[in-house]
């Protein structure tokens, strides 16, 4: 009788040990399915005078002045060349 109780206790213990990893795996999948705040993209747009200032900064970064010593990083030569091509 004692042997039967001991064996049944071991079987129940083994079943409980096997059930714990399954519950932990289910909890991990639940936390993985929730979207994180880090994954969201944010776009910012400007209207009015601020937009033109931001666009001017982008243009200045992409265009490089070929005569930096003459215009001393004011890029007046680039502005002149753009207005020449525009007309």
Curated annotation (Swiss-Prot):
Species whose genome carries this gene: Rattus norvegicus
Family (UniProt): Belongs to the alpha-defensin family.
Biological process terms in GO annotation: antibacterial humoral response; antimicrobial humoral immune response mediated by antimicrobial peptide; cellular response to lipopolysaccharide; defense response to Gram-negative bacterium; defense response to Gram-positive bacterium; disruption of plasma membrane integrity in another organism; innate immune response in mucosa
Signal peptide start-end: 1-19
Keywords: Antibiotic, Antimicrobial, Defensin, Disulfide bond, Secreted, Signal
One Gene Ontology cellular component annotation held by this UniProt entry: extracellular space
Name of this protein: Defensin alpha-like protein 1
Protein origin, superkingdom: Eukaryota
SMART domains for the chain: Defensin_propep
Region (Disordered): 23-43
Tissue-specificity statement: Specifically expressed in small intestine (jejunum and ileum). Probably expressed by Paneth cells at the base of intestinal crypts. Coexpressed with MMP7 in small intestine.
Compartments where found: Secreted
Subunit structure: Antiparallel homodimer; disulfide-linked.
Outcome (variant: residue 71 to S): Aberrant protein folding and disordered structure
Biological classification of the source: Eukaryota, Metazoa, Chordata, Craniata, Vertebrata
Primary site of residence: secreted
Acidic residues: compositionally biased ranges: 23-41
Pfam families documented for this protein: Defensin_propep (PF00879)
Role played: Intestinal defense peptide. Has potent antibacterial activity against Gram-negative bacteria E.coli O157:H7, S.typhimurium DT104, and K.pneumoniae; and against Gram-positive bacteria S.aureus, methicillin-resistant S.aureus and L.monocytogenes. Remains active in the presence of NaCl and Mg(2+). Probably functions by disrupting bacterial membrane integrity. However, does not show cytotoxic activity towards human intestinal cells.
Propeptide span(s): 20-56
């Amino acid at each position: 009788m004692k042997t039967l109780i001991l064996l049944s206790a071991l079987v129940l213990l083994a079943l409980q040990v096997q059930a714990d990893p399954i519950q932990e795996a289910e909890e991990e999948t639940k936390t993985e399915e929730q979207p994180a705040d880090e994954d969201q993209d944010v776009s910012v747009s400007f209207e009015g005078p601020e937009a033109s200032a931001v666009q001017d900064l982008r243009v200045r970064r992409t265009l490089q002045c070929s005569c930096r010593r003459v215009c001393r990083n004011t890029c007046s030569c680039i502005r002149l060349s753009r207005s020449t091509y525009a007309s």
